Design a protein with these regions (language model features):
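N-terminal secretory signal peptides
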Residues: 1-13, 17, 22-31
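Bacterial signal peptide processing site
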Residues: 36-38
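Short, glycine-/small- and polar/acidic-enriched structural segments
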Residues: 42-176, 182-185, 201-207, 230
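Structured segments of extracytoplasmic/periplasmic soluble domains
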Residues: 64, 73, 91, 95, ...
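Short, solvent-exposed loop/beta-turn-alpha elements that line the ligand-binding surface or hinge
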Residues: 72, 126-128, 226-229, 295-303
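Pocket-lining segment of extracytoplasmic ligand-binding domains
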Residues: 105-106, 182, 187-275
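Secondary-structure end/capping motifs
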Residues: 244-319
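Conserved C-terminal helix/tail region of periplasmic/extracytoplasmic solute-binding proteins
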Residues: 310-334
């Protein structure tokens, strides 16, 4: 069930949920790129442009830049930060960037729209503890458990990681499909405020907003770090047309990523200032929000991708049949 709340945003707050909004923009992005799915072969690449939102998932990319790891592996990398999900999706579709830090939903929507891409590696979410999404409510709501949310509106954005996690959490709590009621609120700040002001019974939120809510008295009913398996991943999606000539460059970026992951593991607090700056963490949680561990660069598994594709098909979010090859990382239409 789905309702819609139309509220004007008072501000912007970024986390990887924002990239989930790009799945809606993927189809229009293809139109803006010229509606062409025929991509010419690329010359051998020695550099790479990677697009991202202001999100913790990209910390290793920024650490590699700060520490000079790209130069150590003879590759030039430009990290381009986008202020909106549609801008990121459009730039990827148009070939203005070679890779994007995104999620499986956005990637599948782009592929269904005619954009060839490869899921190069998981940037966050190799384990359930990496990255957090959950359902939060206000203390005035009277909601004490997920069971209390059956039949009540939960603020969420459709075809996003938070919606997927919300469905999994509610299903684990025994809710049927008809008992999960979506209140469509795309903008994260508006969704968060709607929850705190009791305009919705609860909201599906990413980790930074869960932390903000917890710091101000909100109640997290459940999150995906335990109990529902490993259900949320961020990925580096790479354009297939660029990859034709970019395999060596991508391998160099992979090595630099792994160097950055090791550096963060050795001294996570040493990179807090960089994370606060780049991910625009709210001041109230800037000093306390835990710095995640990050995975070494490895392809997403079928167990990560296929359930998401099945969920998208069941929701009719995909306009083409998309399949994942876990041996190569290719995401293609059948």
């Amino acid at each position: 069930m789905k309702n819609v709340i139309d509220v004007t945003s008072k501000g912007a707050m970024s986390r990887r949920d924002f990239i989930g909004l790009a799945s809606v923009a993927a189809f229009s992005a293809v139109a803006l790129s010229g509606c062409s799915s025929q991509e010419s072969a690329a010359p051998e690449a020695t550099s790479m442009k990677i697009g991202t939102m202001q999100t913790e998932d990209s910390l290793p990319f920024w650490v590699a830049e700060q520490k000079g790891f790209y130069g150590d592996h003879d590759v030039e990398v430009e990290i381009i930060t986008f202020q909106s999900a549609q801008e990121l999706s459009t730039a990827f579709a148009a070939g203005e960037i070679d890779g994007a830090m995104t999620d499986i939903m956005v990637s599948a929507s782009l592929v269904a729209s005619g954009i060839g891409l490869n899921l190069a590696w998981v940037t966050l979410g190799a384990t359930p503890e990496q990255g957090r999404f959950g359902i939060q409510t206000s203390p005035e709501s009277g909601i004490k458990s997920l069971a209390d949310l059956k039949g009540k509106g939960i603020g969420v954005g459709s075809n996003t990681v938070p919606e997927y996690v919300m469905d999994k959490l509610m299903e684990a709590a025994g809710a049927s499909e008809g008992e999960i009621v979506n209140e469509e609120i795309k903008k994260l700040p508006v969704r968060y405020e709607s929850m705190t002001n009791n305009q919705v019974a609860a909201a599906a939120l990413p980790g930074s907003l869960l932390a903000l809510g917890e710091a101000t008295g909100m109640i997290t009913l459940a999150d995906d770090t335990q109990g529902v398996g490993n259900v949320s991943q961020s990925v580096l999606a790479v354009r297939s047309s660029w990859l034709e000539g970019g395999k060596a460059a991508l391998e160099s970026v992979r090595l630099a990523w792994n160097d950055a992951v090791a550096a963060i593991e050795a001294d996570p607090e040493g990179f807090r200032d960089l994370l606060v700056e780049k991910a625009n963490l709210p001041g109230i949680v800037a000093d306390t929000d835990p710095i995640s561990s990050y995975p070494e660069a490895e392809l997403p598994t079928k167990d990560m991708v296929d359930p998401v594709l099945d969920w998208m098909k069941g929701k009719e979010y995909l306009q083409a049949d998309v399949a994942y090859d876990s041996e190569t990382g290719d995401l293609k239409t059948k």
